[in-house]
């Protein structure tokens, strides 16, 4: 197995036999399935009428942006003469990492919002929106 030196944390060792875009397409399909499942789970709970749909759309757009922005990664190809050829693809890895952190924070906020909304509405009937309980 070949060693790659001086590889930063933002670099990913990619499989040279698998094009990066097919992996990206697979991740997009899986993520779309997860978002549709979340929507179906919370569809009847009254959360969807509020901010959950906007939150899910915002998270979906941010993560799609992550998938379409290529990371900085290195591919290693074994040449016929036995040597290993390294090809480094660079991109805005810092921007991608910042968006990754932002998407993670939004996901945590969405989960906290759902839990708090569930606890706040626990035991109450389905009340109209805009009515303030004093």
Swiss-Prot record:
**Keyword Transmembrane in annotation:** yes
Location in the cell reads:
Host membrane
> For this UniProt entry, which residues form the secretion signal?
none
Instruction: Report keywords, A-Z.
Output: Host membrane, Membrane, Transmembrane, Transmembrane helix
Q: Which GO terms describe its cellular component?
A: host cell membrane; membrane
**Which branch of life, at top level?**
Viruses
Membrane topology, as annotated: Multi-pass membrane protein
Mark the transmembrane ranges: 21-41, 52-72, 95-115
Please tell me whether the keyword Manganese is annotated for this protein.
no
Broad class of where this protein is predominantly found: host cell
Q: What is this protein called?
A: Uncharacterized protein ORF134
């Amino acid at each position: 197995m070949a060693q790659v030196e001086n590889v930063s944390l933002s670099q990913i060792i990619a499989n040279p036999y698998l094009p990066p875009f097919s992996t990206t397409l697979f991740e997009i399909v899986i993520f779309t399935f997860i978002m549709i499942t979340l929507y179906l789970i919370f569809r009847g709970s009254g959360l969807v009428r509020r901010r959950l749909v906007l939150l899910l759309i915002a998270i979906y757009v941010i993560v799609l942006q992550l998938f379409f922005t290529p990371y900085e990664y290195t591919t290693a190809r074994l040449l016929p003469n036995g040597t290993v050829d390294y090809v480094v693809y660079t991109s805005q890895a810092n921007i991608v990492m910042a968006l990754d952190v932002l998407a993670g924070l939004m996901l945590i906020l969405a989960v906290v919002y759902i839990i708090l909304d569930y606890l706040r509405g626990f035991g109450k009937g389905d009340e109209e929106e805009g009515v303030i309980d004093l």
